[in-house]
């Protein structure tokens, strides 16, 4: 089953992404596969500008920023034991995981 598995992690909190990536790397290394990463991908920032008042004062505005953080992990020489270990792994609820085989 020796194939490459690519895992993308995405979250609005960088600490959750880093802890999840660390957990995955530790689990995969314990299962005996090779790991490349976690590789930090560019942070995507969305900025929203809104008026402070509902009706007047166009010059008075407020900006909000929403940042999403991403990490990439590549797993090489994976076995059935590695896949089982990844399936049993519990990650925090604020992390989106995308897996490509």
Curated annotation (Swiss-Prot):
Say which family it is in: Belongs to the universal ribosomal protein uS10 family.
Q: What's the name of the protein?
A: Small ribosomal subunit protein uS10
* A Pfam family assignment: Ribosomal_S10
Record's PROSITE patterns? RIBOSOMAL_S10
What this protein is reported to do is described as: Involved in the binding of tRNA to the ribosomes.
Query: The organism sits in which domain of life?
Result: Bacteria
Question: Which GO terms label this protein's molecular function in UniProt?
Answer: structural constituent of ribosome; tRNA binding
Record GO biological process: translation
Q: Which NCBIfam families match?
A: PRK00596.1, rpsJ_bact
Spell out the subunit comment: Part of the 30S ribosomal subunit.
* InterPro entries named among the record's database cross-references: Ribosomal_uS10, Ribosomal_uS10_CS, Ribosomal_uS10_dom, Ribosomal_uS10_dom_sf
Sorted alphabetically, the keyword list is:
Ribonucleoprotein, Ribosomal protein
Gene Ontology annotations for the cellular component aspect, listed alphabetically: ribonucleoprotein complex; ribosome
Which SUPFAM superfamilies does the UniProt entry name for this protein?
A: Ribosomal protein S10
Q: Give the originating organism.
A: Porphyromonas gingivalis (strain ATCC BAA-308 / W83)
Q: Which PANTHER family match?
A: 30S RIBOSOMAL PROTEIN S10 FAMILY MEMBER (PTHR11700)
